[in-house]
Amino acid sequence: MFTFYWAKTIDTINFAKKFLADGGQIFVGGIAATLVPAEMQAEIGNNVKIHIGLLDKPTDLNKSDSVIIDELPPDYSILEEIDYKYPARNAYFGYTTRGCIRRCSFCAVSTLEPIYKDYVNIQAQLQITENFFGKKQNLLLMDNNVLASEKFPQIVEDIKNCGFGKDSIYILSDEYDLAIKNLRAGFNDRAYIKKIIRLYEELEKKLPEVEAGKFYLAREKNFLLHFITATKEKILEFDSMAHPLFQKYFKQGKRTHYVDFNQGLDARLVTEENMAKLAELNIRPLRIAFDHYEQKGIYEKAI
């Protein structure tokens, strides 16, 4: 949560309150809510419950719930709802550890994730993501200090088991089939109607001129030229025409997998042994954190 989104976030929360049913409850959590809970509570009122910290216990929001929200993968379908192309849209997001062993004065991690957890099994998260949203090219890991983990060798093995070992490649997922599958399942209809309209437009550019004309007219007849007029029912009916064309003209190519420890590695913990383990992965880029100038020598040695 960056400060320049503060007003917009508060407005969104207060807008959501208008739709709260009698006896219902709104929870607000995350970075800003954890760092400045009093300031946020003053803006949104006492009828909204602020959750401080992670949702890493099954009873955090509901005493009878068995789900650990922190271990669930993100809902990648929200990226299909927006026109902006998120730069990291073709990446899995996750953690293999939580927290940090350091307590740097400038850093909020010790407040956000105060207890260092040296292992989070990422394999199940990536499998769920692949089933719902297809394979991603990159693995963007948000660990704050992965090298501090005594289970670092196991973490590397987990990542390799997910297909991100050295020189690993993968076959692109069929975006149209995934979108149709999720639309049939009723999973975020808005997102997948919008995505399928975009895929129609991409397909049309690949078709021979005469076939492209027929496809356009068929879309027009079924009100499938624009997201605002398209309906789920019409898209599912139109699948009998669209599916064979996607199969014929959309080839599932191969790509190289890459891993990015996005928050950087702790230069003080770089050793020959853990660098040898990292070399078993397709790392790009390799980030080493440089947080204190007085540690310049340590940083240079790590490089």
What are these regions (language model features)?
Residues 1-89:
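Glycine-rich beta-alpha loop elements in corrinoid/cobalamin-binding modules
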Residues 5-9, 32-35, 55-59, 99-101, ...:
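Short, solvent-exposed loop/turn segments at secondary-structure junctions
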Residues 27-29, 49-53, 93-95, 138-142, ...:
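A structural signal for short, well-ordered beta-strand segments and their strand-loop junctions
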Residues 87-124, 128, 133-135, 147:
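Canonical Radical SAM [4Fe-4S] cluster-binding loop centered on the CxxxCxxC motif
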Residues 127-303:
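Conserved SAM/AdoMet-binding glycine-rich loop
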